[in-house]
């Protein structure tokens, strides 16, 4: 089974790190990267092509 590719976008570092830590414990999820604002999220989404983007 192919892993779900996730990008995390949040302006709070501790939230990004916490979500990433939780998601990395799941075998079927791959955290592609993190973004600290909307512009960075758009840039990374275009470059990394995630299946899911978690944003606040």
Which ranges hold each PLM region?
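Active-site residues of response regulator receiver
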Residues: 10, 56
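Generic detector of well-ordered alpha-helical packing
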Residues: 11-12, 38
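Active-site beta3 strand of CheY-like receiver
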Residues: 48-54
């Amino acid at each position: 089974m192919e892993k779900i590719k996730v990008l995390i976008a949040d302006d709070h570092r501790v939230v990004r790190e916490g979500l990433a830590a939780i998601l990395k414990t799941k075998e079927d999820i791959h955290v592609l990267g993190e973004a600290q604002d909307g512009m960075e999220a758009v840039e990374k989404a275009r470059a990394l092509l995630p299946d899911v983007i978690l944003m606040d």
